[in-house]
């Protein structure tokens, strides 16, 4: 896949389908308003908690870097939202919730309402629901999908973006088991050991509010910070050609998943950790 390294984000008003395709093909981040009433009503925090609180979502501890344990732990949505609402650890967020979307039927609503975003010759569509504690930051990472969209349905998020040509300064880690390409750098509070390289990196900052959506091209690094109690829909697409271009990485993913065994960390550990943080405060 080709990529662009210009340090700029395009902002467009009410684009047509044709205009959106043309701009996305430039491979630059794009922000635009996308007020889809069905998605805004169905996928906001209040409705999710009311209608689907008894279903499981996946919770991730952003401070857990143990490669021998599972990254994600299932929680009832109402339990996860309680942690997000009451916890002050600023380390838990939820993603990779495809099973949740299927069980609740929300995936059909996302499929019915993404025609404007879906590129031509698409071979695979992936949908996700992302939310987290106020103040939590997702890892700095990039994806290989042909198109990646993040759509804010409630709350507010901040995003930091880094172009692909700065990868050499980011200590890239390729995790084929989870198919995640990440960096240990925290762009929000840079660690001392990475400050020299951080000075060589140019960062773009975005703020997204309800009804706004961002397109993040393949190979662009990004990290999200939840500044309020927020919910975000993620739409990812592969085309036949992009899958072919990424076939070496996809093969590595399949091979790695056959060879790795991970330990499950206890659900009670998350609850105890959250209680300890509350007691300190």
Regions inferred by a protein language model and the residue ranges of each:
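N-terminal accessory scaffold of Fe(II)-dependent oxygenases
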Residues: 1-213, 221-281
